[in-house]
Design a protein with these regions (language model features):
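Non-catalytic beta/alpha edge segments that cap or flank active sites
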Residues: 1-150
Length: 150
C-alpha cells in the first residue's frame, strides 16, 4: 500500500513499490494487493481495515506518510485500525535507520496487528525502504506465523 503525499514524485513512489515487491518475492510471498492511496487518514484507515479483514492478506506493508508533515497520516491511520502494536519492530527500524541517517529517528512508523494480519509502516524514501526491507525480511515469516497461530 503506497501512501501518496501531495507532490509525490511518481518515480520515487514506483521505486518504493518495486523494492518492496522484489524483496517479498525473494521470500516467496505472493502479493495480492498493490494500490496507491491518497494521504487522507480515513482513506488509508479504510484500505488497511478492508485488506486486513480479508482472508487473503496475512500482512500489509505501507510506504510513505510516516514523517512529521501535515500529510503524514499513515501512523495515525494504522493506530486507528490495529488491535495491538508491536513496538519493538518500529523501534529497531528507527534505531537501525538512525545509525545511517540521523533523520530516521523522526519517523513515526508503526507496526501492529489487526485480527490475524500484521501491518508494517515504512517511509516513502526508496533508500530507506530498501534498508528496512533487508531488516524485516528475516522477521516477517516468523512474525506472521505467530499472529496466524494465535
Amino acid at each position: 500500500l503506497i501512501i501518496k503525499l501531495k507532490g509525490s514524485d511518481r518515480e520515487q513512489v514506483n521505486a518504493c513499490s518495486d523494492i518492496i515487491s522484489k524483496a517479498l518475492h525473494r521470500i516467496r510471498v505472493t502479493i495480492t494487493h498493490n494500490e496507491d492511496v491518497q494521504a487522507h487518514e480515513a482513506a488509508v484507515a479504510n484500505t488497511l481495515a478492508l485488506w486486513a479483514d480479508s482472508d487473503e492478506v496475512d500482512f500489509i506493508i505501507t510506504s510513505g506518510g510516516t514523517g512529521l508533515g501535515p500529510d503524514d497520516v499513515t501512523p495515525d491511520a494504522t493506530r486507528s485500525v490495529i488491535d495491538r502494536e508491536v513496538p519493538g519492530l518500529a523501534e529497531i527500524m528507527r534505531l537501525d535507520g538512525f545509525k545511517k541517517h540521523h533523520s530516521a529517528i523522526l519517523s513515526r512508523a508503526v507496526v501492529g496487528i489487526r485480527g490475524r494480519c500484521m501491518i508494517f509502516n515504512l517511509p516513502g524514501n526508496p533508500g530507506a525502504v530498501e534498508e528496512y526491507m533487508e531488516l524485516l525480511l528475516p522477521i516477517i515469516p516468523h512474525a506472521v506465523d505467530e499472529v496466524q497461530s494465535a
